[in-house]
Amino acid sequence: MKGSCETTMVKSLLLLMLGFAIISSGAARRNPKVGLSALQKAGNCPPLEDNSVRVDIRIFNQNQGISVPRDFQNRSSSPWDYNITRDPDRFPSEIAEAQCRHSGCINAQGQEDGSMNSVPIQQEILVLRREPQGCSNSFRLEKMLIKVGCTCVTPIVHHAA
């Protein structure tokens, strides 16, 4: 399970970097008329616009990921577990999301301390979403907010006037 989560996280991070590279570089090759399928010619698929690019979604050098200690989510004062979300109309189709194990934080004795709060750390990522018209090779770039870990914070206290 850990290997699957790490692979999914690496894929998510690589896709995020790919999206930033496409957006930030003006050198993205544009092919507005290449690869029109019969569905697109019939008008059922969205037309390729000037802001369209062709992307090879195969991930190269998958085994050259950054080496990270495997148990950091267990050693944290705000530990978490990963849940895999699956969506066949999204690339990557599997994304690992963190879920905090406790509402409080873990103290030095290993006990939950309710005077502190365990909260998720969120990261915005870019994913490719398949267009709903049944165009198998038509995707749009979409932002997603995912939980990547948890951290321990002081609670927000509201004082009654």
Swiss-Prot record:
InterPro entries: Cystine-knot_cytokine (IPR029034), IL-17_chr (IPR020440), IL-17_fam (IPR010345). It is found in: Secreted. Glycans are attached at residue 83. GO terms for cellular component: extracellular space. Disulfide bonds join 100-150, 105-152. Transmembrane segments: none annotated. Keywords: Adaptive immunity, Cytokine, Disulfide bond, Glycoprotein, Immunity, Inflammatory response, Innate immunity, Secreted, Signal. One of its GO terms (biological process) is regulation of transforming growth factor beta receptor signaling pathway. Pfam families: IL17. One of its GO terms (molecular function) is protein homodimerization activity. Residues 1-28 form the signal peptide. SUPFAM superfamilies: Cystine-knot cytokines. Belongs to the IL-17 family. Effector cytokine of innate and adaptive immune system involved in antimicrobial host defense and maintenance of tissue integrity. IL17A-IL17F signals via IL17RA-IL17RC heterodimeric receptor complex, triggering homotypic interaction of IL17RA and IL17RC chains with TRAF3IP2 adapter through SEFIR domains. This leads to downstream TRAF6-mediated activation of NF-kappa-B and MAPkinase pathways ultimately resulting in transcriptional activation of cytokines, chemokines, antimicrobial peptides and matrix metalloproteinases, with potential strong immune inflammation. Homodimer; disulfide-linked. Heterodimer with IL17A (IL17A-IL17F). Forms complexes with IL17RA and IL17RC receptors with 2:1 binding stoichiometry: two receptor chains for one interleukin molecule. IL17F homodimer forms predominantly complexes with IL17RC homodimer, whereas IL17A-IL17F favors complexes with IL17RA-IL17RC. IL17RA and IL17RC chains cannot distinguish between IL17A and IL17F molecules, potentially enabling the formation of topologically distinct complexes. This is Interleukin-17F.
